[in-house]
UniProtKB/Swiss-Prot annotation:
One of its GO terms (biological process) is sorocarp development. This is HssA/B-like protein 16. InterPro entries: HssA/B-related (IPR008455). It comes from Dictyostelium discoideum. Belongs to the hssA/B family.
Length: 89
């Protein structure tokens, strides 16, 4: 039973790592599109956008979907703080 359980757990680990790789690729493409859409802000918001993109990039590197959410939220907040000519387009 122990050998069967360990083989089963190895199979589960392989399937989890495959799904993490796929989500990491999709998150990377989403993060890069967020960087392009939310860029070009004036005033103090480029710093906020840069911090959001760096945090998002680090989290995406680990395969966590939260990275994209953090980048998007920081892009929107940066747009609101900078005025009407800035934000995600």
């Amino acid at each position: 039973m122990t050998l069967l359980a360990s083989i089963s757990s190895i199979g589960n680990v392989k399937s989890i790592s495959k799904s993490n790789n796929f989500s990491s690729l999709s998150n990377s493409s989403l993060q890069s599109s967020n960087s392009i859409q939310c860029g070009g802000c004036g005033g103090g918001s480029p710093l906020i956008g840069t911090v959001g993109n760096l945090v998002g990039g680090v989290l995406v590197g680990t395969g966590i979907i939260v990275g994209t959410v953090v980048g998007t939220v920081n892009g929107v907040v940066g747009g609101l703080l900078s005025g009407p000519n800035c934000g995600c387009h």
